Amino acid sequence: MTTIRSIDFETTGIPSEADPQAIVEIGWQDIEYDGMGWAGLVPEGRGSFLCNPGRPIPHEAMAVHHITDEMVADASGNVGLIGAPDYFCAHNADYERQFHNPGVPYICTYKVALRLWPEAPSHGLQFLRYHLNLPVVSAEAFPPHRAGPDAYLGAALMVRILEEGRASLEEMVRWSNGPALLPRVNFGKHKGAKWEDVPLDYLEWVANKSDLDRDVKANARHHLKARAA
């Protein structure tokens, strides 16, 4: 049986080279997967704890997760306590990876959802909860933007992904290590168009001459390669 640990971090802010930021809360929910289409949540494999970030929590971050300096003043949790399962998963796992990258493979449920359900109007975790009618216990998924409930909801999404059976764990890890494969253009004169409908010369400009971000340029290269196949 394979253990996949869904995790979520609440933090002091978005990390950068100049300011790595810090974790204020960690949540997790374990999933067991038999490799043949069955997956389920582990009732006793769930929890959350607060972490003292060693710095004041900005009000902008408090406004998202409602964790205050007073709440974490005596917290003793640290990221090492979440252990080393067979896989980690997280929604927008690139974010969690910036705070914890122990060598365990990560699966990004956001990047996988983009590939499995490209026509979904949104791929945010809360939207997918309702769009896919995930069988969650509402009290366990509340409040949003707290680490325990978000890890639980992310695990429910991961179970649905595994039940779909459309990609192996290894394939999902590969997708997660690459760019987010966006279904539609989200900028410029072709905003809203499907990438496969964008003119070839525009794809070439995005891929080779623009200063757009890594994911956007990778999307253009992906579709250029697909057309050349």
Language model feature labels by segment:
Residues 1, 228-229:
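Short intrinsically disordered terminal tails
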